[in-house]
């Protein structure tokens, strides 16, 4: 078992060690550190609040009805949402738990940034989807609060996380620990499902951030 201050944590419970200097907070381009690859985990939501199981043809029909001006605004909305979320949530995570908290902040900022883009995309185009997406975003904000992710439900007073982590190598990275937080997995799967149903290409977003996020692990 490694401490949260260690560079490469072991799978399972880990003790927070005192006296370790925190890592340098993320900086540079506001969009650099908010993009990231998401784990291919199954959705943990029992009920899909957006009813995303409607036919793909219907989804494409809805999106094709969006005026070209709105589509242009959508692109700006995704970028603005991702940019605005980055600094806030990474800093909150950094303040709460150094390396692990900062990596959780990266994932939270990414998820909420994409959801902000969805909300902006439907505003003025489809009132029902706008309201439903806004509700999803509001719920995500509450469940993904850094204080909630690092609460005693998930991390003990001694700094031990209690969710199972599987790394590519023997010692998983903090990025892997953060990605496999049950609440993060749930919302990552939700965002991926929404993007797939609405034809939003998150792969392009993920590629931009992949190498930079690796440096934060």
UniProtKB/Swiss-Prot annotation:
Keyword Cytoplasm listed: yes
Intracellular or extracellular location(s): Cytoplasm; Nucleus
Chain segments carrying region Disordered: 1-52
Name by which UniProt lists this protein: Protein YAE1
Transmembrane segments: none
Gene: YAE1
Quaternary state and interactors: May form a complex with LTO1.
Keywords (A to Z) from UniProt: Cytoplasm, Nucleus
GO biological process: protein maturation
Annotated disulfide bonds: none
Protein's job: The complex LTO1:YAE1 may function as a target specific adapter that probably recruits apo-RPLI1 to the cytosolic iron-sulfur protein assembly (CIA) complex machinery. May be required for biogenesis of the large ribosomal subunit and initiation of translation.
Residue ranges, annotated region (deca-GX3 motif): 77-117
InterPro entries: Essential_protein_Yae1_N, Yae1-like
GO cellular component terms given for this protein: cytoplasm; nucleus
Highest taxon in the source lineage: Eukaryota
Family, per entry: Belongs to the YAE1 family.
Pfam name, any one: Yae1_N
Record flagged with keyword Isomerase: no
